[in-house]
Every structure is written in structure tokens, then in C-alpha cells.
């Protein structure tokens, strides 16, 4: 169909005609990268590492890739080991970033802290996705290797325990699984006895002029946090006047992002456990899925969640 009042323009999609092409383009074949192109891309790369540090040297890959020692003849145990080892590496980075952010908050250097907190949230997203890989293991596959695990359990992860303590979920009884390793026990105990990240943020609120109750600012750091009205009142002021308290407003949202991601990690842990072992007791002696479901009720930053109802 032609538009009213004249011929269809060249190349009009409704005319049935094709637009004219340059004569040269009609005869040119598309360029297909060949061996010469590939050679040009790496021929200047260093190939001799007999006297210099290589990629594998820098990353200590020999040690990392030689750290998987399945105890069973079952094919699926390698997945189980690597899943947990990589999770421990991500937790190591999460602890490193959280402690860096904590140091920044103590010196009122909030922009660097925001960057580190955002990174921790992305790390937690990686940990959430990792459960999708482990969930490819079926109940029968796990049952074949479970007898070889003994009493070992993720419940005994000292990095996870430090992460919980650093985020404020304190419980002195959780030191006991590490009593057989004095070096590890000292690390975990130090995290238990120190202010959590959120404790330092509450101190920041006080430094910014908010009237925080003295008993909230100096307390027994080994005890879990409880909701504090003066802290919620401070956050209420921040949320009602974000332009006046922009850094604190951004801090609040970074913390909510962080706890949101942490909750998702916990939830995927529960569903993966239920999918693979159902409601059996955990290898470490916990009730398994019911224990993990109970942990879903733990709130790390209570005032930041409750203030949303008050607003």
C-alpha cells in the first residue's frame, strides 16, 4: 500500500520494495576472525613464568585447588565440599568489608562505609545464589555421603558465627563449638565482646546530636540488642527529614538492604535443607530445618524496621 499523494519512499516497510544498497556492500563478505586475528591478540603476552609470579602463584591456586578431600566414594561429595568452601571465602570477604566499614563509622567517614556495606550486600546475593547449586543434590545423593560427615556441620562455622555477632545477634553459648581450638575461640570471643556494627551506628547517632539513652550507648556487648525507644525516635527524625540528615538516611537504607539480603540467605538455607534432608536432625545435633526456621525470626536492626510502621 502506498501513502496517499505519491509513491512509497525507497525502503518503506509497507511498499514491498527494499531500500537501495551501496554497490560495494552488496559484494563484500562479512569479516570472519581467523587465526591471524587470534595471534595478534596475545602474541605479546608473557608466556615464561619461570622467574616471575604467575596467575596461579598470586592466587595460591595449588593450595586452594588441593583443599578438597572427599571422604566418601560418592560423586556428589565434591559439590558439597566446594559449596561450603566457597561460602567460607565469601564470608571471609564479608567480614573484612564489615570491619572496614565499622572502622570508617567510628571515624565518621561514612561514604567509604556505604561502599563497603553495599559490597557486603552483593556478597550475600552471591551466597543466596550458591544455594541454587547445592539444591541440585537430591535426598538420595545426600544420604549416600551423609554418614561420612560425622558431626561436622555448618553450625560450627566460626566465620559465620563472627558474622552473626558482628551484625548484633549475640549468644555466648555459641562459643562452645570452638572451645577445642583456642586460637579460633579467641577470635570469636573478641567479636562477641566488642560492640556490633549497629552498636557503632547508634553511637554515631549520639555523636550527631540525637538524645540516645546512656544505657544503650554503654552496655554489656555480649548480650543481644533490644528495641530502644530513643534509637527509634532518632531514626524517625532522620526519615522525616532526610535532606537534613542525608548521611544517616543513607546509612539507614544501607543497613536495611544488608539485613534484607541476610534474611534471603537464611531463607534459602532453610528451603535447601528441607529440600535435601526434610526435617531430619542436622549432622551437628541441631533440629535441622526447624532450628533454621526459628532463626528467620531474628531481627538485627529492630528500630529500622519498626520505624516504618511509625512513619
Swiss-Prot record:
Cofactor: binding details: Binds 1 heme group per subunit.
GO biological process, one term: L-tryptophan catabolic process to acetyl-CoA
Cofactors (names): heme
Reaction it catalyzes: L-tryptophan + O2 = N-formyl-L-kynurenine
Pfam families found in the cross-reference section: Trp_dioxygenase
Positions bound to heme: 269
Keywords: Dioxygenase, Heme, Iron, Metal-binding, Oxidoreductase, Tryptophan catabolism
Annotated stretches, region: Disordered: 1-37
Enzyme Commission identifier(s): 1.13.11.11
Low complexity: compositionally biased ranges: 17-27
Residues noted as binding substrate in the record, renumbered to the chain: 80-84, 142, 146, 283
Presence of the UniProt keyword GTP-binding in the record: no
Recorded metabolic or biological pathway in which this protein acts: Amino-acid degradation; L-tryptophan degradation via kynurenine pathway; L-kynurenine from L-tryptophan: step 1/2
Source species, domain of life: Bacteria
GO molecular function terms noted in the UniProt entry: heme binding; metal ion binding; tryptophan 2,3-dioxygenase activity
Record flagged with keyword Iron: yes
InterPro entries (alphabetical): Trp/Indoleamine_2_3_dOase-like, Trp_2-3-dOase_bac, Trp_2_3_dOase
Complex formation: Homotetramer.
Family statement drawn from the similarity comment of this UniProt entry: Belongs to the tryptophan 2,3-dioxygenase family.
Purpose: Heme-dependent dioxygenase that catalyzes the oxidative cleavage of the L-tryptophan (L-Trp) pyrrole ring and converts L-tryptophan to N-formyl-L-kynurenine. Catalyzes the oxidative cleavage of the indole moiety.
Protein's UniProt name: Tryptophan 2,3-dioxygenase
Organism placement in taxonomy: Bacteria, Pseudomonadati, Pseudomonadota, Betaproteobacteria, Burkholderiales
